[in-house]
Amino acid sequence: MKHIIPLVLWSLIHLFLLFSLPAHVLAQSKGKLQAGAATSNITPPLGELIVGGFTPLPADEVHDELHARSIVLDDGNTKLAFVLCDNVGIPREVYDAAKKQIEESTGIPIANQLMAATHTHSATSARSANAMVHTTNLNDYQRFLVSRIVDCVRIANKRLEPAKIGWGSVQEPSQLFNRRWYVVEEADRRNPFGGVDQVRMNPGASGLIRPAGPIDPQVSFVSVQSTDGRAIAVLANYSLHYVGGVPGRTISADYFAVFANHLAKLLEANESEKPFVGILSNGTSGDVNNINFQNRGKRYELFQKMQEVGELIATRVHASMKDVSYQDTLTLAAKTEELTLKIRKPDTALLAYVNQVLAKPKDEKPFHVHERTYAERVLQLAESPEDVNVLIQTFRIGTLGIAAIPFEVFTEIGLEIKDKSPFKSTFTIELANGSYGYLPTPSHHALGGYETWLGTNKVEKEASVKIVSKVLELFHLCSASPR
C-alpha cells in the first residue's frame, strides 16, 4: 500500500500539470491547428511621394491609414505566415530584410513567409531606384516598413490559439473588365517606341472591337476561427487591379481596406475583445480593372466606387462563409525556389530611337505622350544586369494550394494555374515576395499594349511559361508533403 500511494499522488500531479498547461500548448502537442492574426500601421509621413501615376506627387492628406495585415498558422509541425501590405509594389530586398528578422524572432522559416502588396495606387512608394538591381541600402520608409512587417508577424505569432480553418469561393463578375482591347483607330494603338500595337489598354468608348483577354470572377477566401467560432481572420483573393477615385495627393488603401473593415462589421467582430483581421489580396489582375468600357455608367464621387466595390466583395464573402466546413487538423506545407529570368534589353534600333526622343525639344509634339518616360526606362534596362533571380512560392493548407508570384500577373495565367493545379482549390497572390513589373503571356507580347512595353515589362517574353511550370512543380511537391 505504501508503494501505491506515491504512485497515485504522482498520477494526480501529472494530470494537474497537464490540464494547467495553456490551451495553445495542449493544441500543439496534439497536432491541432493554431492561428493568430494582427495588423500594424504602415502609413508614411506626409510629403512622401505617392506612386500610381506617371508623375508621383507628394502626399498632403490621409483618407484612411495603410496597414500590414498578417496571419500565422501552425499545424504542430509547420508554421506559415501571410503578410499583405497596402502598397503598390514592394521590392524583394524589403521583404528579405523583414523575413530574416521574423525568422530570428519567431522561428518561422524564411521559406514559409509569404509577403505581398495589395497594389493600391494611393500609397507612398516602397520601390528602389531599379527593381532589377538588388540592394541592401534601404531608404527611411523601406526601413520603417521592414520594422512594421516584423512587428505585425511577431504579434500574430504571439496570439496563436487553438483554431479551425476552412475555405471557399464565390463568383462576382460584375466588377471585372479586361482593360486590353482591340480598337479600330491606328492612332489609338501607338506605342512610345514609334510603332503601332494591335491592342490598347484603357481605350476610349469609340472604335471598340473586343477585349483581348478574359476575367476571373472567382473570389476565393480562407476563414480562420477560434475553436468556439469567433472570427480570427479571413484572407480573400480577387483578381481586380485597384479601383481608385482617390485624389493624387491623398493616401488610401483603396478597396482592400474597405473590404477588411466591412467584413469585420458584418461579422460583428468589432464587438470582440480580440481583434479580427480581414485581408484582401490581389489575384491575377494585370490586365483587368473595373471600368466598363462599353458602358461607362454613372459618375462617382471621390472614394465612392472603392467603397462600393469593397463592401460588395465583403458581403459576398460573408454570405458564402455559412457554407464553409471547418477543420482543426490538417497539413500545412511551403515550397519556395528561386527562378532565374533574363532581363529584357533594347536592341540597337530601339536604343537609337529613344536617344532621338530624348534629343528632341520638350515642346515638340511627340509621337506618343509617354515617349520620354519610356526612353528613360529603356536606357535604365540597357544598363541593368543580364538576369534577375525571382522567388516563386507555393503554400498548402490541406487541399488548398496558394501560389505567390512577384509580378502583376495576367488573368489567363492565374486561370491556367487553377486549371492545372493538383489541389482541389487554388488561387494566386500577385506582387508577392518582390515587384518586377507586368507578366504578360508570350501571345500578349505579340499583341503589344502598355503592359508589354519595355520598361513596363522587364523580363524575357517566355517568363510566364517558366513561372507557371515552376509553380506547378512546387505545387506537386507541396501536395506530396507528409502529414
Walk through the language-model features, giving the residues of each.
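Intrinsic structural disorder/low-complexity segments
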Residues: 6, 17, 122-124
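Positively charged n-region of N-terminal signal peptides that target proteins for export
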Residues: 1-4
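Conserved beta-alpha junction segments in alpha/beta enzyme cores
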Residues: 28-276, 281-284, 288-308, 321, ...
